[in-house]
Swiss-Prot record:
Keyword annotations from UniProtKB, A to Z: Membrane, Transmembrane, Transmembrane helix
Superkingdom, natural source: Eukaryota
Gene field: TMEM269
TM spans (from-to): 60-80, 124-144, 157-177
Protein's membrane topology: Multi-pass membrane protein
GO cellular component: membrane
UniProt subcellular location: Membrane
Identification of the protein by name: Transmembrane protein 269
Length: 203
């Protein structure tokens, strides 16, 4: 959540490259924290609520601010994005073990942050991408639970590669890496990231 708050500050200071980098670091850190809490079996109602608040702050509010709020259309889209992230967290209970219903907010945020870095904050492209992410978050499809740090070794290598790229390579290269990673999760959820078929909702 702290990184999300820093991202918000950078966005208001019009330093979108720093704001985007904070979100990419948060994307990786979120996976590490979830793996750690699962491993040591830390789970409580308060902890779950704090986690949801952190996810909303970082991957909802901070991500939406990448769109800018100095224009009417971008401001409205930012509000819709925050609302979609909030709705997703509050009401999208999958009902199927080890799955997410709708695209998880961290992946949508990662795509927005990566796009911002690759396009140097191009508002039109960011707004188009944000519109797509809203649709994916509100989608009724199921995505596999991404236990990357508790899964096959090659997935752990993907994660380690992301950390190395983010801290030791040019931002454009690390942004491209994270973008491809997140897009692969959207378009090949089961083939690459899940062990069971990506389920469709039953009517």
């Amino acid at each position: 959540m702290v990184l999300g708050l820093f991202s918000i500050i950078f966005s208001f200071s019009r330093k979108c490259h720093y704001a985007s980098r904070m979100l990419l670091v948060s994307f990786l850190l979120d996976m590490a924290v979830r793996a750690m809490t699962s491993h040591i079996n830390i789970c409580s109602k308060l902890g779950a609520e704090l986690n949801d608040f952190a996810v909303f702050t970082t991957f909802g509010l901070a991500s939406a601010l990448l769109l800018g709020v100095d224009g009417l259309l971008s401001g409205i889209l930012a509000i819709i994005y925050v609302s979609a992230a909030s709705f997703h967290l509050c009401f999208y209970s999958p009902g199927v073990p080890s799955t997410y219903k709708g695209l998880p907010c961290p992946y949508a945020s990662c795509i927005l942050a990566s796009t911002s870095l690759l396009t140097k904050g191009n508002r039109f492209i960011l707004c188009c991408m944000a519109s797509l992410m809203i649709l994916f978050m509100m989608d009724q499809s199921y995505y596999p639970y991404d236990k990357i740090l508790e899964s096959e070794n090659w997935k752990k290598l993907v994660y380690i590669g992301g950390v190395i790229m983010l801290f030791f390579s040019p931002l454009s290269l690390s942004a491209f890496y994270c973008l491809m990673w997140s897009l692969s999760y959207i378009f090949f959820p089961d083939a690459l990231w899940g062990k069971a078929a990506c389920l469709s909702p039953q009517h």
